[in-house]
Amino acid sequence: MLKNKTVLLGVTGSIAAYKIANLASALKKLHADVHVLMTQNATNFINPITFESLTGNKCLVDTFDRNFQFQVEHVSIAKKADVVMIAPASANVIGKMAHGIADDMLTTTVMACKCPVYISPAMNTNMYENPIVQDNMKTLEKYGYHVITPASGYLACGDTGAGKMPEPETLLQYILQEIAFEKDLKGKKILITAGPTQEKIDPVRYITNHSSGKMGYALAKRAAMRGAEVTLVSGQVSIAPPPFVKVVSITSAKDMFDAVTAVSKEQDIIIKAAAVADYRPAVVSDEKMKKKDDQLSIELERTDDILKYLGEHKREGQFLCGFSMETQNMIENSREKLKKKNLDMIAANNLKVEGAGFKTDTNILTLITQNEEVSLDMMSKEDAAGVILDKIKGMMS
């Protein structure tokens, strides 16, 4: 994913420095060329040898390292970098950068960089909230640097509050968002639905399905990485919200209908990957239903057909993609759905085929349009998301 990309990691003096070893390792696994620059204080928290072992590149601390190859190191590395991530970023380094002070390998290199630079502050809450630090971060943002809002939580000093460096996986997402993919969907608004709905029977019970939301979340994540403005309307799932995506959390089919129709007109692309209930209880009990007889009958009524509504109200130039999970006659049933609901494309899969069902990390899809059927091999849902977006982009161009 990151082959031929160079990532520069800047590590400063903070207890969170040890976590950047995981970030360096993750980047290397994605085939990035990873270089690490450390401040002298950072070496008190983690040994440079750790980064050298993980990246295969010399970890630079001293601006005047005589044992390194003869180049103006800070300039040559700055020219190579596709993105810089300074994490953890101490108040000291943030202050230096905001005022143009370049007195070590890290600050001199960043000063010479023309690529995007991300800064992830990590410090005590009182330090983070200090007006001087806040002003310094605003100054850096004014100069075009990207300052990542720290998380809140229990800090190494024993305090609880803002100032905690996000986890390496989150920092990785910022890097991937910047350099992993061509921004070929920039300027496009994409609405994606994901996950199951829940239809209440009483305060304790509800009707739902086995959808995990993985396919919809993969689509949202990949679309955002390719530059789209993404809105994800999601049922109740156990997946972390994708970064750089607006997530609207819903519970019932009615909730999803309202959330989708509120923003559908302004979207360029709508992908409905959610598994929405077709029926709901006609009457919802206010109290828990007690066991009385051996059998219980619940009257059901139809929910609103979201995809049908979208097809009927599709504006000119808007692309509408649905999903179809079948257990028999997959192509015939999916093609009928494509026509009946005025879709541009439908992604069909068979629940009975291993690797294509609910809650799996893989999928086996057939992309069906008015004129063709394209059968895909089994692949990860993230890769399948990329293929779906490629197909949509090709059909819209």
Please describe what each predicted stretch is.
Residues 1-118, 124-213, 217-397:
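A cross-family phosphate/adenosyl-ligand binding-site feature
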